């Protein structure tokens, strides 16, 4: 992993030299510098344009904004890593919009920022009615040098015994566990057409089978129930 992620500049207006001006509208106060970038400030999560036009934008959190001796506006940022950039690469347990907050800090030109995004807590992410292209979520902090994650243990869930991610789930009607559609061989289209799903263990109850023999049901992601409160070592699942 390179120490920096070079970006490509885009045409942003920059004003320099004004003093003691408060944040007003699109203007951001940087000591004696006003940067008229219009859409980001310290603490925001932003998309940074990569040098390779074929790659998706990098995601970073703005830690500090300042101008150097030549009045070039610089952004101190903390990178988010996508699963593909971690030591173990992307695995089945990773959500499509999952990011890791790394300990990789960097300095980039303000010109490389092409827009804002939102990195939600996982709980808030699962409550979104509509997930936009700008929406991501983060559960783990990630040490770029060692590949270690914090926290290092997470709950696992029924059937696949994998950490929960944001992919499509359905609920088992009798025991109320949640399972990934892919783990039970059901597509999203099939799940929408059917009403209930009964797991193998619950189907041994004859009354249950008679009452709930019609198939599957789609499910929301609230009130998840771990698999017998099992926990797994994140190092085994995320780092290998």
Swiss-Prot record:
Keywords: Chromatin regulator, Metal-binding, Nucleus, Transcription, Transcription regulation, Zinc, Zinc-finger. It is found in: Nucleus. Gene3D superfamilies: 2.30.30.490, Zinc/RING finger domain, C3HC4 (zinc finger). CDD domains: BAH_BAHCC1. A zinc finger (PHD-type) spans 155-205. Transmembrane segments: none annotated. It comes from the Eukaryota. One of its GO terms (biological process) is negative regulation of gene expression, epigenetic. GO terms for molecular function: chromatin binding; histone H3K4me3 reader activity; transcription cis-regulatory region binding; zinc ion binding. InterPro entries: BAH_dom (IPR001025), BAH_sf (IPR043151), Znf_FYVE_PHD (IPR011011), Znf_RING/FYVE/PHD (IPR013083). It holds the Pfam family BAH. GO terms for cellular component: nucleus. Residues 38-153 form the BAH domain. Chromatin remodeling factor that binds to methylated histone (e.g. H3K4me2/3) to prevent their acetylation (e.g. H3K9K14Ac), likely by recruiting histone deacetylase (HDAC) complexes, and thus regulate the transcription of target genes. PANTHER family: OS08G0421900 PROTEIN (PTHR46364). Recognizes di- and trimethylated histone H3 at lysine 4. Belongs to the SHL1/EBS protein family. This is Chromatin remodeling protein At4g04260. It comes from Arabidopsis thaliana.
